Swiss-Prot record:
Source organism per UniProt: Homo sapiens (Human)
Principal location class: cytoplasm
Position of the signal peptide: none
Sequence segments annotated as region (Interaction with TBK1 and IKBKE): 216-257
Region annotated Homodimerization, chain positions: 1-197
Keywords annotated in UniProt: Coiled coil, Cytoplasm, Host-virus interaction, Phosphoprotein, Ubl conjugation
Protein name stated in the entry: 5-azacytidine-induced protein 2
Amino acid sequence: MDALVEDDICILNHEKAHKRDTVTPVSIYSGDESVASHFALVTAYEDIKKRLKDSEKENSLLKKRIRFLEEKLIARFEEETSSVGREQVNKAYHAYREVCIDRDNLKSKLDKMNKDNSESLKVLNEQLQSKEVELLQLRTEVETQQVMRNLNPPSSNWEVEKLSCDLKIHGLEQELELMRKECSDLKIELQKAKQTDPYQEDNLKSRDLQKLSISSDNMQHAYWELKREMSNLHLVTQVQAELLRKLKTSTAIKKACAPVGCSEDLGRDSTKLHLMNFTATYTRHPPLLPNGKALCHTTSSPLPGDVKVLSEKAILQSWTDNERSIPNDGTCFQEHSSYGRNSLEDNSWVFPSPPKSSETAFGETKTKTLPLPNLPPLHYLDQHNQNCLYKN
C-alpha cells in the first residue's frame, strides 16, 4: 500500500513539473475549440486531483488501521505465546516434581528392601548354622548308636514291651466293656426304680440312710481300734529298741560279771515282749436307734455296709501275722485320755482326727446321725504296756 501511495504522489509531482516545463503552445486552432479543450482538460485535472486526495486519505486511514491491527496481532501473539509457555513450564515443573518424589520413594523402598534382605540373610545364616550343628550332633549320636549296636547285639526288650502293651490294651478294653455293661444295668435299674411307687422309693431312701449311718459308725469304731493297735505297736517297738540298746552296750565281760538282778530284768523284759504280741481285734457293734433299741434286719442277705466292714476287718487283721483273740470277758475297748495326745510325747506318732459321720454321707442330704455306742473301759493290754514303760 505504501508503494502505491508513493507512486501516486510521484505521478502528481511529475505532472506539476511537466506543467512548469511545458510552454503553452500557440493556439493554432480557432478560439472556440481551444476553449473547449482547455475546459475539458481543467475539469479532468481537477477530478484527478480529487481522486488522488481521496485516495491519499484512504491510504492514511488504511495505514493507521494496518498499524492498529498489527499491534493487536502482536499483542495477541505475545499473550498466547506467554500463556502457553507458562502452562508448559508449570506442567514440566509438576512432572519433574512428581518424578523426584517417586524417585525418593523408590530409593526409600529400595533401602528398606536391602535392610530386610540383609536381616533375613543373617537369620537364615544363623538357622543354617544351628541346623548344621544339630545335624552334626545327630550324626554323632547315630554313629555312637551304631557302634553300641555293633558292640552289643540288639535285645528283645521291645518285643516284651510290645506284648505287655498289647496285654494292657486288652485288659483295658475288657474293663471298658465291663463298665459299659454295668452302666447299662444301672440305667435299666434306674428306669425300673422310676417306674416303682413313691412309697417304695421312700423305703429305699430310708434303707440307704440306715446303711450309710451303719457304715459310718463301723468306720469310726474301726478307726479307734486301729489307733489302739498302732499305739500298742509303738510301745512294743520302744521296748525292743531299749533291749537292743542294752544288748549292744553290754559286753561279754560285763555279762559274765553281771549280777543276778540284771538277768531277771532281761527276763522280765522278754516276758513283756511276749505280752506285746497281743493285738486288738475288730468287733462290730450294732448301732443304736434314737429310742435306745438296737437295729436289726429281717432279711438274711448281707448289706453293702457289712461287706465294707468285713473288708475293713481283713485289713486290720493283716497288721500282724499271728493274731490272737482277746478273751471275751464282757469288756471292750474304750478310748483312753492318753490317746488324744502323742504317745510318750513323741511328735512322730500324731494320729489324724477320726472321720465324721456327716463327711461319710458322700454328698447326701444332712440327716440325723445315730449315736455311737458307749465303749467299755480300756483293755488290760494297754494298761500293761503303760506299766512296762513306766518301770523302764
